[in-house]
Amino acid sequence: MAAPLQIGVSVDGTDPASSLRALAETADAAGAANLWLACHLFNREPIACAAAVLSASRSLGAVLMAMSPYTVHPVYAAMAAATLDELFPGRVQLCFGVGAPAALEAVGVAAEHPVETLRESIEVARELLSGEPVKFAGTRHRISGRLAMGAHRLPVWLAASGPRMLELAGEKADGVVISAGTSPAFIGWCLNIVRRGEERGGRAVRKAALVVCSVDADTRRAHERVRRRLAYVLRGSHHARNLQLAGTRLDQAALAEAFAQEDWQRVDALTTDDVVMRHCASGTPHEARAMVQAYRDAGLDEIVVYGMYERRQLDDVLAMMRSQDASIGR
């Protein structure tokens, strides 16, 4: 029998913090396991948002996603996660990631030596969360100290997409999360690399991905809700392999230019229904359910709903996922 598939819901910090309680209640009622709270510079801060979410529910978990060691020191990230876990035991997870290149550039930060920096960040956080005194002398971090709140052995994830980072996730992290807009074929490719890291580290990690979701009785209306959000993601050149493996025809340069010019008609025309269907769980409940199964078959343990924040629409998406089969669980 297949292991239970967990449902998560992503929060990107663009909506008012006052909406978090309702979002948490909706996700909790639908049986979601976690809210994944993104750390995007200039948006709502995820640690404060996590406290609000955890206060609004008795069982929903919170993942601090993807805390960048270039903007948040790993000691501070571990402090935040441990403090939240002290308040809400067993419901907190920590996720590291490099961070969006454009956002780092906007604050004058260069993400140098990313693989080694993330490797050391995972090691530092895990040692601190053990509750023991830490003396760490790496090439990127030097730490001497101990968390005042003692041991909080919570999961440490890594957000990854490139081969070296994916392999690092399998070797060192407790879980890997793959970004939104990725196709089942690309996720399968990613997880094969993660497994190489698992073999080297002699361990197994959990596997999650942000999946753009939209459900409606009218297929096209479902696609329209997520078309521009997906287009924004796929315009990046780093999605070239993702598009190739999915067999997707998309002119990324033209799409990036259309965004820069705010030519929304052109953005919509370039991001065809075929593109949406290959990179989202979108359409009628039956169509979306088939894509959820494809993502699951690629090897995911948790599907994190991305891009759906209006409560009624989120209700519909979570209901569709809950009806997937009997093995959806926390």
Describe each region flagged by the PLM.
Residues 1-330:
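Active-site-adjacent structural elements that line small-molecule/cofactor binding pockets in enzymes
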